[in-house]
């Protein structure tokens, strides 16, 4: 879609956002009915187009979605890059009979060769662009450093293309223009492509082989690029080269947990117990969001005990590997997430401190994982 001005584009985005907010505010029972209708419509349209469909299964959101689709009487394959998930999630995947696809690269190889997934996909993408200059991305790099856009961006200034100053000071030196302005650069790579190699591409290859398009358990309330795409394209989308269904697009995490209870879903142990807050919000006492143990998207938004502290509680050996020795510098010196977190100012040492008092864990709730506008912290790419 082409826009004649930045103002027209902003009006369009605001309208799409307001439409999503309106759907998010409807009662839970109505949301479930809307989801069921989206599922039926997507399957009907797939049949009309000669397409198969499947559920891309990962964490709780997609586990609940797969169960809902089954309860509606549809026999839809469940496909998962299950090896990336927590062991307790893998148990549920096996119970569900998921078809397992293998990652194209190992987690270690991705961190070493591509870079660390940190802050957010959008920010990591910009940092990666600065680190890999070409004549083609020259204008984009200038916008990331200065906020000044070229003709395609209607020559806007102070645009959202610019890295936040906090991270511009730390990563802007990867680009010659940023280095000239005195910005620093890290001694490690940053990348947004981890999900591509670990699950997106493997699942896409399976889908192509089986002429199938996915159901995804994505929600706009997760924020970031997911919210942008869902607000723009809605629940069911059939494009020139892409088709997908996100029946939970207008859900909040509480709605998913509520539906999990109503459907009697086997909730993986990593999520803890289900509880209901005083205002009727459903949440789990353990992890609110799950994914790869090496993922750092959204870490800057978390309070301690953050995800790496909780990893220490579950597996001190795995924590030690990812934090101190999963990668090597050019001189052979081992390093890991600890060095990355030090660089961006995130505390991570002495994780055992947070588990000396078991009451700390019991006090955690979904509200420790919300941003100021009430949306869940963006952590996956998935």
What are these regions (language model features)?
Residues 2-21, 51, 241, 253-382:
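ATP/NTP-dependent adenylation/nucleotidyl-transfer catalytic domains that generate, transfer
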């Amino acid at each position: 879609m082409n826009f004649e001005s930045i103002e027209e584009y902003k009006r369009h985005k605001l309208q799409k956002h307001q439409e999503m907010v309106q759907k998010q505010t409807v009662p839970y029972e109505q949301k479930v009915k809307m989801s069921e209708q989206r599922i039926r419509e997507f399957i009907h349209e797939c049949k009309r187009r000669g397409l198969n469909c499947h559920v891309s299964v990962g964490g709780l959101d997609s586990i609940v979605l797969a169960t809902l689709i089954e309860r509606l009487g549809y026999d839809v394959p469940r496909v998962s890059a299950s090896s990336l998930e927590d062991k307790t999630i893998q148990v549920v995947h096996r119970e569900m009979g998921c078809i397992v696809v293998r990652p194209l690269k190992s987690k270690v190889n991705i961190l070493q060769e591509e870079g660390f997934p940190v802050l957010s996909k959008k920010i990591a993408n910009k940092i990666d662009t600065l680190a890999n200059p070409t004549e083609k991305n020259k204008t984009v790099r200038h916008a990331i450093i200065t906020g000044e856009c070229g003709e395609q961006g209607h020559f806007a200034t102070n645009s959202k293309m610019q890295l936040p100053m906090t991270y511009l000071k730390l990563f802007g030196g990867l680009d010659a223009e940023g280095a000239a302005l005195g910005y620093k650069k890290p001694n490690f790579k940053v990348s947004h492509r981890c999900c591509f190699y670990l699950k997106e591409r493997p699942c896409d290859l399976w889908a192509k082989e089986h002429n199938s398009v996915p159901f995804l358990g994505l929600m706009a309330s997760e924020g970031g690029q997911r919210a942008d795409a869902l607000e723009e394209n809605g629940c069911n989308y059939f494009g020139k080269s892409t088709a997908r269904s996100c029946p939970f697009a207008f859900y909040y995490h509480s709605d998913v947990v509520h539906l999990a209870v109503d459907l009697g879903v086997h909730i993986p142990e990593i999520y803890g117990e289900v509880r209901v807050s005083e205002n009727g919000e459903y949440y789990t006492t353990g992890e609110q969001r799950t994914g790869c143990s090496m993922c750092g998207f959204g870490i800057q938004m978390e309070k301690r005990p953050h995800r790496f502290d909780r990893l220490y509680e579950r597996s001190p050996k795995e924590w030690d590997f990812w934090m101190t020795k999963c990668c090597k510098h050019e001189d052979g010196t081992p390093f890991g997430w600890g060095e990355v977190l030090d660089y961006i100012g995130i505390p991570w040492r002495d994780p055992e401190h947070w588990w000396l008092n078991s009451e700390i864990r019991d006090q955690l709730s979904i509200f420790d994982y919300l941003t100021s506008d009430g949306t869940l912290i963006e952590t996956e790419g998935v």
